[in-house]
Regions:
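A beta-strand edge to alpha-helix "cap/lid" segment located at domain peripheries
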Residues: 1, 53-136
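A solvent-exposed, acidic/Ser-Thr-rich amphipathic alpha-helical stretch
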Residues: 21-74
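Short, low-complexity N-terminal intrinsically disordered segments enriched in polar/charged residues
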Residues: 1-26, 30, 127-136
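Phosphate-binding glycine-rich loops and adjacent basic patches that engage nucleotide phosphates
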Residues: 8-18, 42, 58-63, 82-85
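A sequence-composition feature that detects small, non-aromatic residues
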Residues: 11-14, 29-32, 37-42, 96, ...
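Hydrophobic pocket/interface hotspot
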Residues: 9-12, 23-25, 32, 44, ...
Length: 136
């Protein structure tokens, strides 16, 4: 049995196909925080939207395979395989993530954990200039 928050998470990831940062940021609480393996956390709608805009502008063909999804209270855990295309090359990233929700059903915190060095290798192989990437 899935919770309503699990369905919200599935809808959020499905909406990455829109490549619309405004659609995606609408899932977040105004004071939300999003952190990933390779960069400082983005805080609030403005910073989160900026990162979303960069990511959807940089990649395409977003697909998210849920290996495991579960919830406890206001927290949803995901074990995923994230797939997307950069410079015509497929990227495949195993991810473990936690999404915390506020009382109104908006994402309050999103933390994704993955092997940054494995993704970085894929990005370099696709021709992405990674100079300065470790400064994030």
């Amino acid at each position: 049995m899935t919770s309503g928050l699990e369905e919200t998470v599935r809808a959020f990831f499905a909406d990455w196909t829109t490549r619309d940062p405004d659609v995606l940021v609408s899932y977040f609480a105004p004071d939300a925080e999003w952190s990933e393996a390779n960069r400082a956390p983005a805080r609030g709608h403005k910073e989160i939207r900026s990162v979303l805009e960069l990511q959807v502008g940089f990649g395409s063909g977003f697909e998210f395979e849920f290996r495991t999804i579960g919830s406890f209270g206001s927290i949803v855990f995901t074990e995923r395989i994230d797939r997307f295309i950069i410079n015509g090359r497929p990227m495949v990233v195993p991810v473990a993530g936690l999404l915390e929700f506020d009382e109104s059903g908006k994402i309050r915190a999103w933390r994704d954990y993955y092997d940054w060095s494995a993704l970085e290798r894929q990005l370099i192989e696709s021709g992405v200039d990674m100079s300065g990437a470790d400064d994030a």
